C-alpha cells in the first residue's frame, strides 16, 4: 500500500470479491460510479477527494482462477460519523464491470491513536535518558546507600570469577574496566554490561579475551598513567572496538553518572587511538596481535611420519572485524537466470564481483524513504515485505531467508539476528555501529549498488 495523506484521521479497509477477472482501475471506477449521489453532493466521493477530505484510494488485487479478490484502503479526514457513512456506502457496491461483486468493511483505524502510541513510547525512552544523565539533589544524599545496595548485583563471571554486571552475557556490547570498584560504580549508575580484568594472575584474563572476540567491546580505563598501561596491555591480546577514558587524574570508580555518560559518549574507535601512539608502541601492539593470530591458525606440530589428511581441513570462519575498504574473500551471490546487473561490494573482492537481479536493483531504487524492508530467499523471491520497525520480530518467523534489503541503518543487533537465521546478505541505506560480522556475510549500502 502506498503512503497515506499525512492529515488523514481514519483509514477504511474493505475486502472484496469479484466473480470475474478485473484490475485496479475497474475497482476504483466501480466505487466512484456506483456511489455517485447516494448521500448527496456533500458526501460524494469525487467531491470529497477534490477538497482533500478523502485521500487517494489504494487497491490491492489478487487473481484466483476466474475470480478477483483483494483489499481497498480509503484514507478519510472526515469526522467519525461521516467516515462510518462513507464506509457503509462503499459496501453497497455490488458490481464491477459485468461481474457481480461483494465489498465488506474489515476495519476503520484511527490513525491518530497510532500516532499517540508512538508519542507515548518515545516519551518513555526520553524519560530513561533524563533519569540516566540527570542526578536530582535528593539522589546525591543517597549515593552511599545505593552503592551498598548495588554491590549485591555484582556477579562472578567466567572460570576466573571476574567481577561483572548481570547483563554481560546477554548484552551485545561489553564495557571492560580495571577493578571491582569500577564495576560497582557503573552498575550503580545503570550500566549492567560491565566486567573487570582483575582477579586473575598472568595478565589479561582469558575470559575477557574470549568476550572481546564475540561482542562489541569498550575499554574504559582510569585517566592516569596506570590506566594507559593497562589499556596497552589489553590491546595486545584482546579485540577491542572502542576506547573510553576517565577525565585526566580521575578513576572510573570516582565518576558521577554525568561523567560516565560523557566519557562513553566520547569514546573513539580503537584504530584512532592506536594512530595516536608512538611508532614504537604501535609496532609492539601490532606484533603482539600478529603472534596471537598466527598461534590461532597455526596447526599443531606435524608427526615424524606421513599421516593421512581428511578431505576438508578448513576450520569454521571466526567472527571478524568489519573492514569497509578491503576484502579478500570470494563471494558468490545467487542470481536469476535473466536480467542481472553487476555491482561492487563495499568490500572489494579480488577474484569476482557479486551480481544482483535487476528486479532487486529496481526495488532498491524504490525503497529509499519508505522505511520498508524486503526479505528474499536464495532465488531472490520475496518472502516478506514489512516496515523496518517490525524487521527483527519478523525475522524470527521467517525460514529459508537469504538476503534482506531495507531502508534503514544497519546495527550489530540486526547482524546478530540475521546470522541466527542463516542470512548471507544485508543491503541497507547506511551502515551504523556494526563492529563484527561473519566472514561469509556480505554487507552493502544502497550507494554501492545505485552508483554503479
Curated annotation (Swiss-Prot):
Domain Toprim: 172-248
Entry's Gene Ontology cellular component terms: cytoplasm; DNA-directed RNA polymerase complex; exosome (RNase complex); primosome complex
Gene Ontology terms describing biological process: DNA replication, synthesis of primer
EC number: 2.7.7.101
Signal peptide (UniProt feature, chain positions): none
Cofactors that this protein relies on: Mg(2+)
CDD domains: TOPRIM_primases (cd01029)
PANTHER family: DNA PRIMASE (PTHR30313:SF2)
Known partners and oligomeric status: Forms a ternary complex with MCM helicase and DNA. Component of the archaeal exosome complex.
Record's protein name: DNA primase DnaG
Gene: dnaG
